[in-house]
Amino acid sequence: MIDGALGMAYGVSLTTFLLSTGIPPATASASVHTAEIFTTGTSGISHLKLGNVNKELFTKLLVPGMIGGIVGAYILTSIPVKIIKPFVALYLLLMGVIILRKTFKKIEETTTPRAKLFPLGLIGGFFDALGGGGWGPIVTSTLVARGHNPRFTIGTVNLAEFFVTLTEVATFLMIMGLAQLQIILGLIIGGVIAAPLAAYVCKKIPSKKLMIIVGILIITLSVKTIYQTML
């Protein structure tokens, strides 16, 4: 529900919960992303049908996102994610502040050149696989902060996430095999039920309100992550 409506937080929230129960980071990320194949697919189709997708932006994010996902999934099996997480959290915290700041002044909708979208997609896919989530927070928050329309940004990022997730899961399967089936089934059922409703909410809520919600969510999650890394 949160991910489909705001374009983020599904993987981050669930991975944090799974890690707190003692599940290893690689297993948690693989489980969440396997479930996300179904939830992001459902969410992406819903956004597409409701006209929330910018096809040009979608094509520019797709390939770099998939490449970043492959690299991130591979590294997760060998390097502790705690080393990188604080830096991602600081970046997201800054993005959240920028988004909130822009809600209180006039924003001119704009587009981002392909040259700048490639590294954004690459970084988003990389940290998404590495930390069990991050595609939405990194890509959505950056694009909205740059002035992109929140509705089309969220819908487009959600649709692209399906293909990025599919690539990440394929990489995880080749390296470590199938993750825990019970975890995956539980995540799939809850996510698929909520996805269509989330796309409808995204279409109905005004852009300014969406930006405020996105900004607060990013800041909250970032502060929480930074605090956890300091313990």
Where are these regions (language model features)?
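Feature detects amphipathic, helix-rich regulatory segments
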Residues: 155, 168-171
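Accessory recognition modules or surfaces
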Residues: 5, 40, 112, 162-163
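Hydrophobic, membrane-facing alpha-helical anchors
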Residues: 33-45, 93, 133-142, 164-167
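Transmembrane helix-bundle signature of multi-pass membrane transporters/permeases
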Residues: 29-37, 154-162, 192, 218
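A short glycine-/small-residue-rich loop at the edge of a beta-strand within enzyme catalytic domains
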Residues: 129-134, 157
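Short acidic/polar alpha-helix capping motifs at helix-coil junctions
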Residues: 36-37, 102-107, 162-164
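Juxtamembrane transmembrane-helix boundary motif
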Residues: 1-5, 9-21, 25, 46-131, ...
